[in-house]
């Protein structure tokens, strides 16, 4: 992706988030974006929209199906994408919208990787640690289970990581022995 395309994607995302923020609709926008991104993942819609082999009329039909129960701002955004024939960039734009929402609201997704599933009490403690250590509000808590950690956990928020896993400690110990 070129810098020009990246700038275009970011501009569309910022504009949509600004409009939703002005009308206090960030939560609704975030829900819409997550639902549409889920559709992209389950149907490989991104390939169809970015393919030159798919006629523009078909792309219009596909995006019209996405409009469904979305907010007015999301539907207007999808109409704008169709008018400007930018549907090939829609998936990246929606991801950029989530990033912009996180920046504006200081609310980031938290990924927790542990050797066992977390209890509700542990999840609330993770949210407290994130608020204290990273000075952000925890958005969605994405839980991953990786038995190779042996014990402990890895918390990732906004490109920052806390790794207290036994696996990492063993690796560090191994490096110290060399």
Swiss-Prot record:
Cellular localization per UniProt: Cell membrane
TM annotation in the entry: none
Keywords annotated in UniProt: ATP synthesis, Cell membrane, CF(1), Hydrogen ion transport, Ion transport, Membrane, Transport
The protein's assembly and partners: F-type ATPases have 2 components, F(1) - the catalytic core - and F(0) - the membrane proton channel. F(1) has five subunits: alpha(3), beta(3), gamma(1), delta(1), epsilon(1). F(0) has three main subunits: a(1), b(2) and c(10-14). The alpha and beta chains form an alternating ring which encloses part of the gamma chain. F(1) is attached to F(0) by a central stalk formed by the gamma and epsilon chains, while a peripheral stalk is formed by the delta and b chains.
Protein name according to UniProt: ATP synthase subunit delta
Membrane-related topology note: Peripheral membrane protein
One annotated GO molecular function: proton-transporting ATP synthase activity, rotational mechanism
Natural source organism: Streptococcus pyogenes serotype M49 (strain NZ131)
Cited InterPro entries: ATP_synth_OSCP/delta_N_sf, ATPase_OSCP/dsu
Gene Ontology terms: cellular component: plasma membrane; proton-transporting ATP synthase complex
Family named by the database record: Belongs to the ATPase delta chain family.
Its biological purpose: F(1)F(0) ATP synthase produces ATP from ADP in the presence of a proton or sodium gradient. F-type ATPases consist of two structural domains, F(1) containing the extramembraneous catalytic core and F(0) containing the membrane proton channel, linked together by a central stalk and a peripheral stalk. During catalysis, ATP synthesis in the catalytic domain of F(1) is coupled via a rotary mechanism of the central stalk subunits to proton translocation.
SUPFAM superfamilies noted in UniProt: N-terminal domain of the delta subunit of the F1F0-ATP synthase (SSF47928)
Gene3D superfamilies: N-terminal domain of the delta subunit of the F1F0-ATP synthase
Family matches, as PANTHER family: ATP SYNTHASE DELTA CHAIN
